[in-house]
Amino acid sequence: MSLDKKTVADRYAKALFELVDADNELDQTYQELIALRQVFEDNEGLDAALAGVQLSLDEKKSLIKDLQQGASKYVANLIQMVFDYGRIDCMVAIIDEFERRYDRKMKRMHADVTTAIQLDKQQEDQLKANLAKRFGANEVTLTKHVDPEILGGVIVHVDNKTLDGSLSSKIKQIRRLLVR
């Protein structure tokens, strides 16, 4: 039975996270993994090339050695193990899951924010502070979107939660109440 990508990513990320956390190498490993993810994102098709049949085994091993260059033993071992077990196509998913675990431990959160107009620095800082307080986070990173259709206010997506404080949704609520 073949495991899906999410299950594979969860297992590898959990094992690596627990290992480096116990060895006090969490921050260093996190930084290395973010850099490794960037390599995969900058070289679209790298995972497919390493998993596919276009390259010889020697060519693949050479690429793996290049990826391991300068990496800690933890990251180098992860790369080797994922390659050896034919799961290199899961590498970015593994790193994403590791980052989720890291963020949870460090009380960091990522929020998708939609506003009708561009937020200025003060508004952005205030929103970050409010979200940090509401969700108990030490650090908040915003991904900002501007959508004039919401008319005003803000829509925030965090994890699987949506906080809709937009003017357009308020108008829709009032309209529904009046139609009754």
Swiss-Prot record:
Tell me the GO molecular function terms.
Answer: proton-transporting ATP synthase activity, rotational mechanism
Q: What is the lineage of its organism?
A: Bacteria, Bacillati, Bacillota, Bacilli, Lactobacillales
Tell me the membrane topology, using the record's own terms: Peripheral membrane protein
Q: Give the matching InterPro entries.
A: ATP_synth_OSCP/delta_N_sf (IPR026015), ATPase_OSCP/dsu (IPR000711)
Q: Where in the cell is it found?
A: Cell membrane
Task: Report the NCBIfam families cross-referenced here.
Answer: ATP_synt_delta
Q: How does it assemble?
A: F-type ATPases have 2 components, F(1) - the catalytic core - and F(0) - the membrane proton channel. F(1) has five subunits: alpha(3), beta(3), gamma(1), delta(1), epsilon(1). F(0) has three main subunits: a(1), b(2) and c(10-14). The alpha and beta chains form an alternating ring which encloses part of the gamma chain. F(1) is attached to F(0) by a central stalk formed by the gamma and epsilon chains, while a peripheral stalk is formed by the delta and b chains.
CC terms in the record's Gene Ontology section: plasma membrane; proton-transporting ATP synthase complex
Record keywords, A-Z: ATP synthesis, Cell membrane, CF(1), Hydrogen ion transport, Ion transport, Membrane, Transport
Give the protein name, as stated in the record. ATP synthase subunit delta
- Kindly give the PANTHER family that the UniProt entry links to this protein: ATP SYNTHASE DELTA CHAIN
Q: Which gene encodes it?
A: atpH
Q: Which HAMAP family match?
A: ATP_synth_delta_bact
Family, per entry: Belongs to the ATPase delta chain family.
UniProt entry tagged with the keyword Metal-binding: no
Where is coiled-coil annotated?
Answer: none
Function summary: F(1)F(0) ATP synthase produces ATP from ADP in the presence of a proton or sodium gradient. F-type ATPases consist of two structural domains, F(1) containing the extramembraneous catalytic core and F(0) containing the membrane proton channel, linked together by a central stalk and a peripheral stalk. During catalysis, ATP synthesis in the catalytic domain of F(1) is coupled via a rotary mechanism of the central stalk subunits to proton translocation. This protein is part of the stalk that links CF(0) to CF(1). It either transmits conformational changes from CF(0) to CF(1) or is implicated in proton conduction.
